């Protein structure tokens, strides 16, 4: 096989392995992992969830072809002071949340940690309000504690 750039022979394994390692830097997932890009630039700093204080309620218009005002909240994270927008799931879920409430947010579940569906620029969703899950509040199983 003339013209092949790969070394051949009994003792070529080290050279072949190093060559593979060099090429793995062109893979996006490898580069993100090795340079710890998620931990550096993610507002949650690589954690699955984070606590924050609600600054304001906002309505976000959905992308084409849908037409709706999706309810969301602006949240300031406790651990680093960064401000993110978090979607409030469920019918009437925003009614359980007031300004200055403490909420727990998690990723919304979009591809590669990005936004999901017709919500532009929203990467997080609200999971808990004042220590009570939003799901329990909808179903009427628990009352929201007064802080």
UniProtKB/Swiss-Prot annotation:
<keyword id="KW-0689">Ribosomal protein</keyword>
<keyword id="KW-0699">rRNA-binding</keyword>
<dbReference type="GO" id="GO:0006412">
    <property type="term" value="P:translation"/>
</dbReference>
<comment type="subunit">
    <text>Part of the 30S ribosomal subunit.</text>
</comment>
<dbReference type="GO" id="GO:0019843">
    <property type="term" value="F:rRNA binding"/>
</dbReference>
<dbReference type="GO" id="GO:0015935">
    <property type="term" value="C:small ribosomal subunit"/>
</dbReference>
<dbReference type="InterPro" id="IPR005680">
    <property type="entry name" value="Ribosomal_uS12_euk/arc"/>
</dbReference>
<dbReference type="InterPro" id="IPR006032">
    <property type="entry name" value="Ribosomal_uS12"/>
</dbReference>
<dbReference type="Pfam" id="PF00164">
    <property type="entry name" value="Ribosom_S12_S23"/>
</dbReference>
<comment type="similarity">
    <text>Belongs to the universal ribosomal protein uS12 family.</text>
</comment>
<dbReference type="InterPro" id="IPR022863">
    <property type="entry name" value="Ribosomal_uS12_arc"/>
</dbReference>
<keyword id="KW-0687">Ribonucleoprotein</keyword>
<dbReference type="GO" id="GO:0003735">
    <property type="term" value="F:structural constituent of ribosome"/>
</dbReference>
<keyword id="KW-0694">RNA-binding</keyword>
<dbReference type="InterPro" id="IPR012340">
    <property type="entry name" value="NA-bd_OB-fold"/>
</dbReference>
<protein>
    <recommendedName>
        <fullName>Small ribosomal subunit protein uS12</fullName>
    </recommendedName>
</protein>
<comment type="function">
    <text>With S4 and S5 plays an important role in translational accuracy. Located at the interface of the 30S and 50S subunits.</text>
</comment>
């Amino acid at each position: 096989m003339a013209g092949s750039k790969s070394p051949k022979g009994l003792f070529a394994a080290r050279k072949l392995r190093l060559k593979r390692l060099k090429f793995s830097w062109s893979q996006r997932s490898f580069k993100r992992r090795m340079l710890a890009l998620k931990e550096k630039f993610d507002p949650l700093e690589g954690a699955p969830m984070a606590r924050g204080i609600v600054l304001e309620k906002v309505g976000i218009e959905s992308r084409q072809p849908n037409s709706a005002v999706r309810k969301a909240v602006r949240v300031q994270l406790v651990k680093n002071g960064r401000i993110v927008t978090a979607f409030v799931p469920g019918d009437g879920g925003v009614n359980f949340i007031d300004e200055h409430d403490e909420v727990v947010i998690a990723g919304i579940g979009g591809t590669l940690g990005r936004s999901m569906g017709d919500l532009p620029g929203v990467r997080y969703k609200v999971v808990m309000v004042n220590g009570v899950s939003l799901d329990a509040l909808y179903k009427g199983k628990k009352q929201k504690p007064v802080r």
